Amino acid sequence: MKKLLTCIALGFATTSYAVTPLWMRDVQISPDGTEIAFCYKGDIYKVPAKGGTATQLTTQASYECTPIWSPDGKQIAFASDRNGNFDLFVMPSNGGTAQCLTTHSASEIPSAFTPDGKYVLFSASIQDPAQSALFPTSAMTELYKVPIGGGRTEQVLGTPAEMVCFDKSGKTFLYQDRKGFEDEWRKHHTSSVTRDIWMYDTQTGKHTNLTDHAGEDRNAVFTPDGQTVYFLSERNGGSFNVYSFPLNTPQSITAVTKFKTHPVRFLSTSSDNTLCYTYDGEIYTQRPGVNPQKVRIDLIRDDQEQISDLNSSKGATSATVSPDGKQIALTLRGEVFVTSADYNTTKQITNTPAAETGVCFSPDNRTLAYASERGGNWQLYLAKIARKEEANFPNATIIEEEVLLPSKTVERNYPQFSPDGKELAFIEDRMRLMVVNLETKKVRQVTDGSTWYSTAGGFDYSWSPDGKWFTLRFIGNKHDPYSDIGLVSAQGGEITNLTNSGYTSTSPQWVLDGNAILFTTERYGMRAHASWGSLNDAMLVFMNQDAYDKFRLSKEDYELQKELEKEQKEVAGDKTNDKKKEDKADEKKDEKPKDIVVELKGIQDRILRLTPNSSEMGSAVISKNGETLYYFSAFEDKYDLWKMDLRKKETKLLHKMNTGWANMEMDKEGKNLFLLGSNSMQKMDMGSEKLTPIHYQANLKMDLAAEREYMFDHVYKQEQKRFYNCLLYTSDAADD
């Protein structure tokens, strides 16, 4: 019985670890045509050219790729990032210790051995020649060589020369050029920057163009006699296939393979004229005049993906503070966390391979709303503290999650609770502003999507304190991408354009108890006429004349106004002292925000510029009492925190922070200002203006394989929804 169980266990182990690999990369056949080297999941393998069990040659945790055979087949050069960046290594072709040949901080990718086997040629962006007219970028590499025993690196060519293949004499070699920045994996690309095949004479320094085609021609190799060239091309309107031409008449091109749908990649040839390449993730060999043969590969490998741990105290992609100022919700690596504003206690709310985004708090601080792309579609989720005796998320023991308005087709994202917490606004299908009643689940449309053209995901919007209005960023008069600030009823209707500037205005938020909207605009600074370089100002648009007049009072007049209002309140208070205390229901009723007075007539005449000069602005807020503007601005390097007294019109540098972009939010009472950045978070007491760091510790377990699967699906769906249009493209996106 024990023997039987042992046999069953061994059989199970065999089926668990023996795999038929797919999507092998950087395939190259050995010079004698007996073996094939390739990269699979970041390691170098070799397999008999007739098929069989693959042998693993590298076992480092780093990424190894681009194996290149030496002319005698005894060594393999490859690239590895085991030292941080990709360096060049060489090792025995039967396995063994790898020797590092290069140590430059650039990434070095091998192309070929010289025919005498003494040097390895590689591409890297190290040093442009003094006479070079190329744009200085790492994408435009130079060609170098290094002795196989290590030593001084020499520049062969100062221009991009990739996928080198020597003839037997070593006097000439083929290469593919690179003229631009287009992604090398793009299919069906036709333009002036597509790659061409060239031949270089090492004796005379002459470059000869062998192909002049508007599409891609690349990865050229010589036949053993050096009289014919094989290469990959997307000619004839199809995918990459193998073509050939005589070296003396390169215009006489013949198709060698006729694969459809998928591209042929990674072409190489051996001394017996055997071609080797990949198609649809598998390896093929082909002899002249014979049909391609798939190489059967068995690969023994422990393919069980390990769960990885991530412990991070920075790197949040977004963050928001709870109304009471005691909790901060953040997203990090696509997961939602909540941390204490005063301690580093941090709770993970979600744990999925899919991305979560747009997290926000309910007014009672006990519910989170966010969007998640689980199941392949952006949907809204609510996470609630289950136990009434537990006051916050970081210390909660049970958190209940539910999907809101489940759908497999309609996308919903960027939620925001209404001020009373009874409704939730969100953006539907990336363009429409919608509201759902959380009790009845009834949905109403606020905007119809005709005023937003970007499919990137959403736009800025904000509830008014009384819950009856939205301010939002929108495109007026079809003037995309230049946005204006709008005002629309929370019940839906026509959007009122508050700015009409013709230049980009963004980031609207309600201030001064809802009597004004703060926003930033480039109307006075440098404008993005060439898609970059904007300088912005902070502006206010006032909802009513009374608020506008009060804001423009001098400091002296404003102080007199405050004294008068104080006396009026005291008189009103004396009259109510004789009355009985109101019950709790009445107290709650009194706490309800007052309706905002919106006077649309003349509203465009009630717009004020706050900042004294245009600058590279970040986030901005106005204090609860309306006296001070706080904003991020970058004058020297990164962002610093600035303060402006709105009565005195005085501006000063409050804190020299030299930080990246950060969001600024106040708690509901206006007692603390939160500076929420990716690399650091801080809290500023509004009285003392002292900064206190906020620490969090996000600990999560990552299923990297599941994350990669999600990322692939995400990109595929992005292409379907944001790029592909069957009316514009003749190819099937699902096949491409």
Show where each model-derived region lies.
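A short helix->beta-strand "capping" segment at the edge of beta-propeller domains
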Residues: 19-24, 54, 301-313, 397-402, ...
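Beta-strand-rich domains and repeat architectures in extracellular enzymes and scaffolds
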Residues: 19-45, 316-334, 611-627
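Blade-terminus and WD-like Trp-Asp/Gly-His loop motifs, strongest in beta-propeller folds
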Residues: 28-33, 67-75, 111-119, 164-172, ...
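Predominantly a core beta-strand signature of beta-propeller blades
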Residues: 53-54, 96-99, 151-154, 196, ...
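Conserved blade-ending motifs and adjacent loop-strand segments that build the rim/top face
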Residues: 254-266, 496-507, 618, 655-664
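Long hydrophobic segments that form regular secondary structure
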Residues: 606, 612-649
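Conserved small/polar residues in nucleotide/adenosyl-binding loops
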Residues: 729-735
